[in-house]
């Protein structure tokens, strides 16, 4: 688990994921990039990145892409901010087009194959422009999208080399979205 304690959303997300992993009875190694070195990824099968701003990772973003290509699996659990380092891996994430702005997420449609209770739309109270405006290519499998005319992808996976990226793009990090995060994390495993 990679977090950045200087990013408020990273800290809030860790509070939610700590509970998710406890409920899933899943062990986790936490690396706060502000307090410790980023570990060598070779000893891991999965990495969860709880950062929306990847600039502090610098060239580690490229290392993450190379690690996935060799068979690693990564979940970007927070809506990414378009910047230089994210641009380096956009295509690897399955993104074919992106904007610098975010879009409103007031209703999320969940694919019925993604999780129990899927196949319908969920209203989001206190909605705001929380999702990065992107389009994904045919190689990406989209599991959730905005329930509007734009249908912006909110949860998707994209195989890359021998590995896989999973991206959560809904931008909401609260108790009510733990199920979405847990289901997204399960996409990293071979068995759902």
What positions do the PLM features span?
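A glycine-rich, often tryptophan-bearing local segment used as a flexible ligand/cofactor-contacting loop or short
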Residues: 54-128, 135, 140-141, 145-147, ...
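A general structural signal for short secondary-structure junctions and capping/turn motifs
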Residues: 38, 66, 132-135, 155-159
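Short, solvent-exposed coil/turn elements at secondary-structure transition points
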Residues: 34-36, 80, 145-148, 171
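Extracellular ligand-binding/catalytic regions of CAZymes and related secreted enzymes
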Residues: 1, 12-24, 141, 147-154, ...
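Helical hinge/lid and interdomain linker segments adjacent to catalytic or ligand-binding clefts
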Residues: 2, 6-91
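A short acidic, often aromatic-flanked loop/helix-cap motif at beta-alpha or helix-coil junctions
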Residues: 35-40, 103-109, 150-151
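Short, surface-exposed linear patches
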Residues: 22-25, 51-53, 69-73, 97-99, ...
């Amino acid at each position: 688990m990679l977090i950045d304690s200087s990013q408020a959303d990273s800290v809030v997300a860790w509070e939610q994921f700590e509970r998710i992993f406890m409920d899933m009875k899943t062990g986790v190694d936490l690396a706060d990039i502000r307090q410790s070195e980023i570990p060598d990824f070779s000893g891991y099968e999965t990495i969860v990145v709880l950062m929306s701003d990847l600039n502090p990772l610098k060239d580690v973003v490229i290392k993450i892409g190379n690690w996935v290509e060799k068979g690693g699996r990564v979940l970007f659990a927070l809506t990414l901010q378009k910047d230089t380092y994210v641009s380096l891996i956009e295509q690897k994430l399955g993104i074919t087009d992106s904007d610098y702005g975010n879009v409103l997420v007031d209703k999320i449609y969940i694919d019925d194959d993604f999780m129990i209770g899927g196949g319908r739309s969920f209203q989001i109270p206190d909605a705001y422009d929380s999702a990065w405006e992107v389009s994904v290519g045919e190689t990406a499998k989209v599991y959730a999208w905005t329930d509007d005319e734009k249908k912006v992808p909110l949860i998707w996976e994209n195989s890359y080399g021998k590995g896989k990226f999973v991206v959560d793009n809904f931008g909401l990090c609260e108790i009510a979205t733990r199920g979405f995060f847990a289901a997204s994390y399960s996409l990293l495993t071979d068995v759902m």
